[in-house]
From Swiss-Prot:
Low complexity: bias regions: 153-165, 402-418
Transport keyword on record: no
Functional note: Capsid protein (CA) is the structural component of the virus-like particle (VLP), forming the shell that encapsulates the retrotransposons dimeric RNA genome. The particles are assembled from trimer-clustered units and there are holes in the capsid shells that allow for the diffusion of macromolecules. CA also has nucleocapsid-like chaperone activity, promoting primer tRNA(i)-Met annealing to the multipartite primer-binding site (PBS), dimerization of Ty1 RNA and initiation of reverse transcription.
Organism: Saccharomyces cerevisiae (strain ATCC 204508 / S288c) (Baker's yeast)
Protein name: Transposon Ty1-DR6 Gag polyprotein
Chain positions covered by the region annotation Disordered: 1-93, 126-174, 352-440
Length: 440
């Protein structure tokens, strides 16, 4: 009986099962595969306990405290019930969580370099990466957002979260430096506009078009704290958040004011560098324009001293004002006020000379009348020349006949003949010609 059992449990039939038995167990008569049920249950309990300890072990790294945000846990954004923007344009809980890729599709399909987020917004456990726009690539506001034609058909979770419109909003880049905040806030405002939240953005006067709702304020706060870590915020932004950590609207309003101020500064600098004056406009208006530009720049921290201002003004002078460039004896200590005194003096001299100069120019109407009268008077003269010629020709014939008859007549006085022949014949023509009898 034992031989049959040994033949059944031979190494040939059992292979690796018998090979794993130690040499100590081979000398015993106990079957190596005969394991009691109690030992099996103990092993199962031990393995279950080990697995439970691994899953419940807390993370080794503690989450640092965030002094400017409400909670380091991932933001929970309740979906709006009757919000002004559609459901697909608002982040859900998975979309606001950096570990959820359902809104953007698979990470490998994102055409941007992934970036590890700051741990202050990460919950303990497995973490994933979030897209970042590197500084070398940049995201200009003129670049259209990939809201259309960028569908991810391979992701089933994206289909469940989005509607049939298949529109995706491009997220803003991660803020990585306080100096990059002015450029970052431009992309964040663009992100809000693409999410149908342009009405809550403050306008030029600092007021939004409509009132923000509670759901929109939650969305605004959550997205701001995700994409703008507190350690990279400027000092003035931290001061606002220290008073009210949810006052994102005030941050946006101050940012827009700074953008307008920067734009005005750039325009003033360009205008001051391209000044042109030749006396065509009043000197008072030119002085007011220049002094206002200099005052605005000085108030915004861009100081323009008298030397630089005078050089910029004199470089744009032309005409009679151009010689002010060569007044070297006053260039060192000349002020803007002194330079404008010289400009006013030249302008007043120009105006006085223009007012005192007599006007010798004839009126155009008089010239037209003279030309018309000249044509009218010359016309009858041309017409009257023909009858004069005929009368002269007749008189010539008559005089010649009289001379010939007088020569034949014996009673004619020779002295009178010679006197008449030497007398010039007066012709009534235009050129006033004097013809003698021998010439015709």
């Amino acid at each position: 009986m034992e031989s049959q059992q040994l033949s059944q449990h031979s190494p040939i039939s059992h292979g690796s099962a018998c090979a794993s038995v130690t040499s100590k167990e081979v000398h015993t008569n106990q079957d190596p595969l005969d394991v009691s049920a109690s030992k099996t249950e103990e092993c199962e309990k031990a393995s279950t306990k080990a697995n439970s300890q691994q899953t419940t072990t807390p993370a080794s790294s503690a989450v640092p405290e965030n002094p400017h945000h409400a909670s380091p846990q991932p933001a929970s954004v309740p979906p709006p019930q009757n919000g002004p923007y559609p459901q697909q344009c608002m982040m859900t809980q998975n979309q606001a969580n950096p570990s959820g890729w359902s809104f953007y599709g698979h990470p490998s399909m994102i055409p941007y370099t992934p970036y590890q987020m700051s741990p202050m917004y990460f919950p303990p456990g497995p973490q994933s990466q979030f897209p970042q726009y590197p500084s070398s690539v940049g995201t200009p506001l003129s670049t259209p957002s990939p809201e259309s034609g960028n569908t991810f058909t391979d992701s089933s979770s994206a289909d469940s979260d989005m509607t049939s419109t298949k529109k995706y909003v491009r997220p803003p880049p991660m803020l990585t430096s306080p100096n990059d905040f002015p450029n970052w806030v431009k992309t964040y405002i663009k992100f809000l506009q693409n999410s149908n939240l342009g009405g809550i953005i403050p306008t030029v006067n600092g007021k939004p078009v409509r009132q923000i709702t509670d759901d929109e304020l939650t969305f605004l706060y959550n997205t701001f704290q995700i994409f703008a870590p507190s350690q990279f915020l400027p000092t003035w932004v931290k001061d606002i958040l220290s008073v009210d950590y949810t006052d994102i609207m005030k941050i946006l309003s101050k940012s827009i004011e700074k953008m307008q101020s920067d734009t005005q500064e750039a325009n003033d600098i360009v205008t001051l560098a391209n000044l042109q004056y030749n006396g065509s406009t009043p000197a008072d208006a030119f002085e007011t324009k220049v002094t206002n530009i200099i005052d605005r720049l000085n108030n915004n921290g861009i100081h323009i001293n008298n030397k630089v201002a005078c050089q910029l003004i004199m470089r744009g002078l032309s005409g009679e004002y151009k010689f002010l460039r060569y007044t070297r004896h006053r260039h060192l200590n000349m002020t803007v006020a002194e330079l404008f005194l010289d400009i006013h003096a030249i302008y007043e001299e120009q105006q006085g000379s223009r007012n005192s100069k007599p006007n010798y120019r004839r009126n155009l109407s008089d010239e037209k009348n003279d030309s018309r009268s000249y044509t009218n008077t010359t016309k009858p003269k041309v017409i009257a020349r023909n009858p004069q010629k005929t009368n002269n020709s007749k008189s010539k014939t008559a005089r010649a006949h009289n001379v010939s008859t007088s020569n034949n007549s014996p009673s004619t006085d020779n002295d009178s003949i010679s006197k008449s022949t030497t007398e010039p014949i007066q012709l009534n023509n235009k050129h006033d010609l004097h013809l003698r009898p021998g010439t015709y």
